[in-house]
Amino acid sequence: MKRLALLGALLVSAMAAPSAIAGPQLGGSMPDKPIDNLTMIYATDPALQCYNTAREGADLKFGLEHCNTAVLDPMMNYRAETFVNRGIIRYDLGDHSGALNDFNNALEYNPALGDAYLNQALVLVAEKRPSEAMAAVNQGIALGATNLQVAYYSRAMIADDAGQYAQAYRDYRQALKIKPDYAPAQRQLERFKVVPKGTATQ
């Protein structure tokens, strides 16, 4: 499980559409200049604050409070994405069980949310449940997770750790095909040597 320990940093935040985080009309889009001679106002919508914390990893407890507020708001759209973001924050706080619950809740609201499956897989890896993690990654890939290079890299790491080197190699290459400058996959591929079938290796 040594290589799999690296996967925790790959959690993928889910951005709600602008209509889900409308916020105040003035400054809600974080303008470059003050509007109508007013002091610049930044969006304080709880769902947006939740997303920003999940993405940036700063002030986790503050972000968690905003996530809690957002998911309790009966008028909020894109609840599934907010559960994903809260799950990431909970994972970063060391609450693996809470993170899994949030990713499961996200999938109840939106069963087609590939990012929820991908994040679920990374928590399952941390919990040393690689078979379940592999199934979740596969589902995330099938549903078109936002960052497919992360999905293929994650699947490669799981296969690599299980000694399934051919599959790992293919998935590292697929991650690079999707994002040619993806450094984690580049580093892992440096470990491989490809030789013709039947060739003796030293």
Segments from the language model and where they lie:
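Register position in tetratricopeptide repeats
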Residues: 92, 126-127, 161-162, 188-198
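Residue-level recognition of tetratricopeptide repeat
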Residues: 79, 113, 147-148, 182
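TPR alpha-solenoid repeat register
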Residues: 82, 116, 150-151, 185
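N-terminal leader/linker segments that initiate helical-solenoid repeat arrays
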Residues: 21-72
